[in-house]
Amino acid sequence: VRGLLVVALSLCAAALLASGCGEAKQAAAASVAKPKPTCAYPAGWQKLANRIKAPVYCPGWLPDPLKGQIGGQWNNINSVSADRSYLESFVWQETGGGAAGGELHVNLRAYPGRTKIPTCRTGGSDSRNVPCYADPGRLISANGITTRLYTVNQDADAWHALLLWRRDGTLYTLSEHVAPPLTFDHVVRYLKQELGSLVLIKPAV
């Protein structure tokens, strides 16, 4: 009987040890940090940050085939204004015979030293001043950044879903065109993935 008791106690101890090891492994796995986003084309974004003397956000991911390379194949607008605000636009359009006419269009903007939403002109015979970004909706967060979703936007961001946030006295936006083959909900999912991929690049000078 005593021998059986010793065996039973040994088995219980082994089971408890195994359980503890399993829990330790689970805790260790849970504590492993997610990999940080990576800027695939840092040179152009560093040059932009140096030029405007303010931090910029480099996209680590854009929907295929877009690449977040300033001066690259898909970068159709690379514009910096006198007030240091900038627009970086990346676009792909399906063209040619039999094409369905799909489009992917992503804009990134910043307004250094300004947090107020800028004013735009509506254009046309009844042109008037309106906020460039309007009809704010829900909050969307990723990558430590909390943004507000805007759905009525002007100029290059017209017909785009747009994320807006502020950091250290600067207003930033990230927007994407709602156009085939993407639905509004699909665009919002893409925007959250793009937001999660952003890498902050500070000026070196």
Features from the language model and the residues they span:
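Bacterial N-terminal signal peptides that target proteins for export
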Residues: 1-8
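C-terminal motif of bacterial Sec signal peptides marking the signal peptidase cleavage site
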Residues: 17-20
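Bacterial signal peptide processing site
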Residues: 22-24
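Extracytoplasmic/lumenal low-complexity Ser/Thr/Pro-rich segments of cell-envelope proteins
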Residues: 26-31
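Short, solvent-exposed recognition patches
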Residues: 35-168
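Surface-exposed amphipathic alpha-helical segments
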Residues: 168-205
